[in-house]
Amino acid sequence: MKILVVDDSSTMRRIISNILKSSGYENIVEAADGVEGLNQLKAHSDVDMVLTDWNMPNMNGLDFLSKIRETTPGSQLPVIMVTTEAEKANVVAAIKAGANNYIVKPFTPDIVKTKLEPFLKK
């Protein structure tokens, strides 16, 4: 399973990647913003899931999510928002835009694993 992690913080990308690796998911691709994320999706058409931050430069996570959903292959791709945007209206906006789940930072490894479990395959 290949997972794309998109966050402008290299520290956060490393934290999320380490959580995924500790669960046995070694095939991880990273991007620093939505534009780079779209480029990674084009370069890696076999991505099985995307975890994306909301607040990023160049293209934010909500716009990135919308761009993914506009493509035929992306319409079924699980996309999980991982963000500090904890307000109810933001959660609703992300789900309406097509997010499959929503993780609020800060989080624990158990929260990430539990939220991703329905979408993960080994």
How would you label these PLM feature ranges?
Residues 10-29:
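Two-component/phosphorelay signaling modules centered on CheY-like receiver
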Residues 30-39, 61:
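Helix N-cap/capping motif at the beta->alpha junctions
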Residues 39, 62-75:
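Short amphipathic alpha-helix used as the core "switch/output" element in two-component signaling
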Residues 45-51:
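Active-site beta3 strand of CheY-like receiver
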Residues 56:
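Receiver (REC) domain active-site loop signature in two-component systems and cognate sites
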Residues 107-116:
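C-terminal output helix
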